[in-house]
Amino acid sequence: MCAAPNNPVIRARNLKRYYRRGSETVKALDGVDLDLRMGEMVSILGPSGSGKTTLVNLLSCLDAPTEGTLAVNGHEVAGRSEDQLADVRRGTMGFVFQKFYLLPTLTVAENVELSLLFCRRPVHRAATMEVLRQVGLADRASHRPRELSGGQMQRAAIARALIVEPKILIADEPTGNLDSHSGEAIFDLFRSLVVQRGILLVVTTHNLALGYLSDRVFTLHDGRIVKEEAGRGA
């Protein structure tokens, strides 16, 4: 079952995630509602400890909620086993993180193709080159990571996420290790990918200026969404 074109591809209602810390209950998320659709770029803003990573882990099906309902691409997440959550992620989601996680002994093209190997899909170099072209790295395909700038390494990581043709791209603090110019270039790339591919792109950041380049901006504080605004991309 997949979400209909006009329906949310991610829908969360009263989403809560609590943890035990000794005798204390920590409310990492405390009642979050979200409707996220294909073809939009969404930023989740908030300081460290606000619940951004916890929320992203839930939206990514890397964790399950303590309470509330969460449906991803038509699949209810609550009550599923780790294997079942992996099935929801596989072929639906791509991930980009603050750290690039590129293998130093492989070329850029080979690093990108690792995602296909993990998903047990055939590797076609022409498809790899097309993805590298989209992220502006076609001329770096045979380079090793050590020959790239920080911004170029993050572009390679984005290409690796895109090669599996995800419907949803989750980026957790993707510009945290980049300078301001490179960070803005990455957000510009994200915007173009949303337009070209029609994907849902969810990005977390503590950088207000970058966050407002999205279509919609959600601000988290103490595990709650305290503000929803239109971004400059809307």
Identify the role of each PLM range.
Residues 1-18, 227-234:
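ABC-family P-loop ATPase nucleotide-binding domain
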Residues 8-220:
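ABC family nucleotide-binding domain
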Residues 84, 224, 232:
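Residue-level detector of flexible, active-site-proximal loop/helix-junction positions
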